[in-house]
Amino acid sequence: MNTIYLIGDSTCHKNSRKTYPQVGWGQVFSMYVNDNYKIVNLAENGRSSKSFLEEGLFKKCEQNIKNGDFLFIQFGHNDEKEDVLIHTDPFTTYQEYLSYYINVAKKNNATPVLLSSIYRRHFDDNGIIKENCHLDYPKAMEELAIKENVIYIDMCELTKNMLIELGDEPSKKLFMNFSANKYKNYPEGKQDNTHLRIKGAKKICEMLVEQISENPTLNIILKK
């Protein structure tokens, strides 16, 4: 059996009951993948392309990835933060860390796939989505994908357009944005426009699966 490795941050991470109703898209991805593949979700909260590697979180994948496996790589949300332990620069260190993951996959005859970050649900007071929420990281990832001849799926642009289509208020149901006393873990409510609830996680997967289905290298992983 082959493996699909997922590496990234909290938007992909497998959550526990303690953080319910927060759900990473990686938690529900198996619903769309056929039984010939197992999913190993290594994504961790708060990690960047830099800290994920330097904390040793990539070791399990690096030691086990093999011919026929896939490596889905999604970083960017935390790379922009100023903390020196996690920050990367889009066109230098960010690309260097992404290249490391890509090269590990390639040397083991696995397929690396670059995914840009899902767009933050940031609307202005007029209900207009804020532009350039993720700075130059998606552009830098796309540039690297072209250079390395790697599959690139622009989840940032796709999810931005989805948010525009849904609008400010309706899109709240996809995110950890809700009123008080709705969930036991968050009695005071939550106004989090980055992390997903189950509807959001499924929506992200549906959009990702649509892109995968159109790619002959990737669509072999999907359920018929």
Per-segment meaning from a language model:
Residues 1-44, 59-71:
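Serine-esterase "nucleophile elbow" of acetyl-processing enzymes
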Residues 2-7, 44-47, 130-142:
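Short, charged N-terminal helix-start/capping segments
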Residues 9, 42-47, 86-87, 126:
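Short, basic, glycine/proline-bearing loop/turn elements
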Residues 11, 51, 193-195:
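Residue-level preference for alpha-helix termini and adjacent loops
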Residues 14, 49-50, 81:
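Glycine/Thr-rich phosphate-binding loops of Rossmann-like dinucleotide-binding domains
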Residues 48-56:
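Structural motif
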Residues 56-202, 206-224:
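Alpha-helical cap/lid subdomain in secreted, periplasmic
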